[in-house]
Amino acid sequence: MAKLFSRAATFDHIQAFLEDTHGQITIGEIPPIRRAALAAQGKNPRVSLVGRPNETVPELLQRLDVALAAFIASGTITDEVLPEIKRRRAAPQK
């Protein structure tokens, strides 16, 4: 089993996003992407991240928190998922 957090992590921007927007956070598979993290308001994605090789869930959540800070501060939308799906579809099949 993976090692538990040795220190408490805070995700202030995730907390603020959930409280202020009544949005949702999802972590999971979006085929063909094995691991992704999404923050959305209704059907409107605000942040979508692709899990990196060997990235832990806490590390992915930390990146989500940072990206949500940018969204909260300036409305910056981050989308790693759609470009990655397009890239994989365009790649030659083995």
Q: What spans do the regions from the language model cover?
A:
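N-terminal acidic leader/helix
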Residues: L4-R35
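Short, well-ordered helical secondary-structure segments
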Residues: F5-A8, D12-I14, G42-N44, S48-G51, ...
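Short, charged, intrinsically disordered terminal tails
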Residues: R7, S74-K94
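Short, flexible helical or helix-coil boundary motifs
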Residues: T21, I25, L68-F71, G75, ...
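Compositionally biased, intrinsically disordered low-complexity segments
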Residues: G28-I30, V50-R52, E80, R88
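Amphipathic alpha-helical packing elements
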Residues: R35-D79
